[in-house]
Swiss-Prot record:
Could be involved in insertion of integral membrane proteins into the membrane. Keywords: Cell membrane, Membrane. The keyword Membrane applies. It comes from Bacillus cereus (strain ATCC 14579 / DSM 31 / CCUG 7414 / JCM 2152 / NBRC 15305 / NCIMB 9373 / NCTC 2599 / NRRL B-3711). This is Putative membrane protein insertion efficiency factor. One of its GO terms (cellular component) is plasma membrane.
Amino acid sequence: MKQIFIGIIRFYQKFISPMTPPTCRFYPTCSHYGLEAFQKHGALKGFWLTCKRILKCHPFHPGGFDPVPDKKDDKVNS
């Protein structure tokens, strides 16, 4: 499932994004953020993080540096 989403993002980056002017307000761009989110967190959480990011990418948000959060360790420290 994760590979399907990554494939969709790569298709967008290669074929759709070059035909449009750069409009992303963030660094890394939303598509790069999505790739990293899926690679770090898997399909479910990667999808959630990517959707949240895309919804923030509009003219009324200041944008800026917004990295993908690190994956939290599921182990409880003893």
